[in-house]
Amino acid sequence: MSQGLQQKENQLRQLVTEMQMMEGTVNTFQQRLQVVLASVSELRVAKQSLEDLKNIKSGNNLLVPVGGAAFINATLGELDKIVMGIGADVSVEMTYEDALKDVNERLEEMEKAQGSIEQQLGQIMAQLEAHQRMAESLSAEIQQAVQGSI
């Protein structure tokens, strides 16, 4: 086996190893993106719900989802205080305005995170595609060299 052929095979092995690492990174970014997208969706629902509740008079009946496609009848109280989860099973009471502001700020943060992850994912995908093209080219060169030596 010629030294040039051996060098190309080593390059191909290196590319394959790098591609495997990139694929792992892509999977990690895709998982992170799914988590962020779920948060964005949840925050949009919270924002819309808070905005919609402001237009409903106190004392009106509502159907409140409790999970599993089940609902309960509830009567809307005053919206002067909203209980907001702040993480680690801790909740705080806020004014309506502060709660809406908090939801909007969280939504903005998650949308920025989404954009950042999508950008990084796009970059790593472009690198992966470039590596795949190089690997295909090297593989073809190796195959040609092997067939030429037979």
Predicted regions and their residues:
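Intrinsically disordered, low-complexity regulatory regions in eukaryotic proteins
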Residues: M1-I86, V90-I150
